[in-house]
Design a protein with these regions (language model features):
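Hydrophobic alpha-helical transmembrane segments of multi-pass integral membrane proteins
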Residues: 4-8, 34-50, 66, 70, ...
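C-terminal-most transmembrane helix of multi-pass membrane proteins
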Residues: 40, 219-221, 254-301
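Juxtamembrane helix-loop boundary signature in multi-pass membrane transporters
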Residues: 1-11, 106-166, 281-301
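C-terminal transmembrane-helix exit sites in multi-pass transporters
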Residues: 51-54, 105-130, 258-278
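Specific transmembrane alpha-helical segments of multi-pass solute transporters/efflux pumps
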Residues: 19, 52-96, 138, 227-245
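Juxtamembrane C-cap of transmembrane helices in multi-pass membrane transport proteins
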Residues: 18-30, 42, 81-93, 101, ...
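Specific alpha-helical transmembrane segments that line the substrate/conduction pathway
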Residues: 34-45, 84-118, 247-266
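Glycine-/small-residue-enriched transmembrane alpha-helix faces in small-molecule transporters
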Residues: 1-34, 73, 149-177, 264
Length: 301
């Protein structure tokens, strides 16, 4: 059984992440920036008692602080903002599609790593990246047909989802630069802290200050649930599983995440993908798997 504990932990983490979109649906009356503020604030409060000793022993350099700020802006602010906004446009795009488009993150991660870290890029990468992007189009638009009655709304919703994939994928590169110097728990805490600090002036500058007092008790409960379950808890379970699982196996297991989200969307929201979207989904996930494998092969050279 010990041989299976790692993969089981990764699948549990993937399942928790899949629930994230469904939980956020209950917060549709709140501005996305307000959701970001509270989920990071709650995460910060919950995380602090467990890592304050690590914080006392850590001193960040000027370069490391800039990396934390950059990661917070990309991942904490824009990534979460665009993802939450995309989920709010359920009249144009299903939750399943939003989650599937997140699998494009490795394309942005590898491209940014090539630019900023000068990592090698295999020539075969372009072929699989083009396939992934083509599949993403058919995932977004059923049968490849753009309904011009709702086409603009669908495109905007898809662009928000792609924007989230870009922000999170690119921040992976900067996180890699930071994690080489700073403990993961400490960098996560500072990312949450900086995100909270950044969102405060944005809330008031754009007239959302009053929304801080509008969440209901149940919405506060959902915000806390996001911070604990699909946020930190999922991440801790994932890292525990990753420590006991080879990279090759974990890469495959992580690809179960969008399909778990699709199943949950079908069961809870009665959303069913068309045959063309299912085919495109498998093509998208397989091409991303090949891209990740190519990156592993290049890293070993």
């Amino acid at each position: 059984m010990k041989n299976y504990t790692g993969p089981i932990f990764i699948i549990i983490a993937a399942t928790l992440w899949a629930f994230d979109g469904l939980i956020r649906q209950h917060l549709y009356t709140l501005p996305p920036i307000t959701i970001i503020f509270f989920e990071h604030l709650f995460g910060l409060i919950i995380l602090f008692p467990f890592i304050y000793k690590y914080l006392l022993g850590t001193r960040l350099t000027k370069r490391e602080w800039w990396l934390v700020i950059l990661i917070s802006i990309l991942s904490g602010l824009f990534g979460t903002l665009w993802f939450t906004t995309a989920l709010g446009k359920v009249h144009f795009i299903s939750i399943s599609v939003v989650f599937l488009l997140q699998k494009l993150q490795p394309i942005f991660a590898i491209t940014s790593a090539r630019i900023f870290l000068k990592e090698k890029m295999d020539g075969r990468y372009v072929k699989w990246a083009v396939l992934a992007l083509g599949a993403a189009f058919f995932v977004t638009f059923k049968n490849g047909y753009v309904n011009f009655a709702t086409g603009e709304g669908t495109i905007i919703a898809a662009l928000y989802a792609l924007g989230a994939a870009f922000a999170w994928g690119t921040s992976t590169t900067f996180s890699k630069m930071l994690l080489g110097k700073v403990d993961a728990k400490v960098s996560t805490f500072y990312r949450f802290l900086v995100t909270v600090i950044i969102t405060i002036p944005i809330l008031f500058l754009f007239g959302y200050g009053a929304s801080l007092s509008t969440p209901t008790i149940s919405q506060f409960g959902f915000l806390a649930l996001i911070a604990v379950s699909t946020g930190m808890l999922a991440l801790l379970i994932y890292y525990k599983g990753l420590a006991k699982t080879s990279v090759h196996v974990s890469t495959i297991l992580e690809l179960t995440f969008p399909f778990i989200a699709i199943i949950l969307d079908m069961v809870i929201n009665n959303t069913v993908l068309s045959l063309s979207q299912w085919i495109a989904s498998f093509a998208l996930v397989y091409s991303i798997y090949k891209i990740v494998k190519l990156r592993e092969e290049v890293a070993l050279l």
